[in-house]
From Swiss-Prot:
Record protein name field: Elongation factor Tu 2
Pfam family, one: GTP_EFTU_D2
Encoding gene, per UniProt annotation: tuf2
Region of interest called G5, as start-end residue ranges on this chain: 174-176
tr-type G domain mapped to chain residues: 10-204
Compartments, as annotated in UniProt: Cytoplasm
Region (G1): 19-26
Binding-site list for GTP: 19-26, 81-85, 136-139
Any one GO cellular component localisation term in the record: cytosol
Region described as G2: 60-64
Keywords for the protein's UniProt record, in alphabetical order: Cytoplasm, Elongation factor, GTP-binding, Hydrolase, Magnesium, Metal-binding, Nucleotide-binding, Protein biosynthesis
Organism, as annotated: Shewanella sp. (strain MR-4)
Protein purpose: GTP hydrolase that promotes the GTP-dependent binding of aminoacyl-tRNA to the A-site of ribosomes during protein biosynthesis.
Any one Gene Ontology molecular-function term assigned to this protein's record: GTPase activity
Uppermost EC category: hydrolase
Amino acid sequence: MAKAKFERNKPHVNVGTIGHVDHGKTTLTAAISHVLAKTYGGEAKDFSQIDNAPEERERGITINTSHIEYDTPTRHYAHVDCPGHADYVKNMITGAAQMDGAILVVASTDGPMPQTREHILLSRQVGVPFIIVFMNKCDMVDDAELLELVEMEVRELLSEYDFPGDDLPVIQGSALKALEGEPEWEAKIIELAAALDSYIPEPERDIDKPFLMPIEDVFSISGRGTVVTGRVERGIVRVGDEVEIVGIRTTTKTTCTGVEMFRKLLDEGRAGENCGILLRGTKRDDVERGQVLSKPGSINPHTTFESEVYVLSKEEGGRHTPFFKGYRPQFYFRTTDVTGTIELPEGVEMVMPGDNIKMVVTLICPIAMDEGLRFAIREGGRTVGAGVVAKIIA
């Protein structure tokens, strides 16, 4: 059976379900799949297909994730659902599944629970920009006042973590009843889909963002000058553009005088392409791997930041022992390792393999970074953790 042709005629948006264990994330995922397939066409995925999440490896970390797709009249969605809490933590920190928005599932029979809070905090730390709430199991609550109380509680919790709790959409429904085909509850799934369409703005495509290319290699070509190679992370670079070389050393400006791909000369290099960029008047020794080439003023070098980190377990090939304050591993950003020191939160003495933890990192030399940048923590080339820049300090 040939795979269906991927049509790019609709904007593509990445979403996912988050929330406490057993609040109905996977059931909701199945319900969305069924109701939208029934209403707008497409393939419906069963609960068992979604629940049996395949194992993936991202930066050496084992994560179980289910990916499903569905359509509304105006958009195409890719949706991730994870079976276990640890999978969410790993997924969000490594950016294995970057979300343009998340659906927070809260059982109205329980109200917000510890992982509800933790997933909201993680969403804030890793930069999930929008959250929509689906209050599940509303068929099991007869008291309208109780539903109102749970909704207020969820909204307050979201506001506590700087999400617009008073303004974001909250849909009251029942994933199970919708999955069983009861029209009044199916209507709530359509309402949820409409909220996704209207509340989550269309994500800016990588190609429309300011140009950035991590430098992987530097060559000098006699008679032509210095060429840096790498994969363009975002934006477009055109011949004649002014660019900055950022990170590790003092930021310098130069001009792109040529773009090459597969030995062919081009006018421009675009997001996702591997290319060589010829720099005017730049010496071979002025640039090194680990720096980035970027649109002037679009990114700055920093050394100190707050991060959210997942420490690999022993089974994942991580450390066998905890680490303490004063730990000095390497932090791998894009293409290079930089040594740094860590500061643990107050009251935390040690960090065990398998933990996730907030820490302040100070690097020995500056790296071009924005909030949301992912990194690995390594010891002698072996990955022992994964992290994300949550807040830049200096």
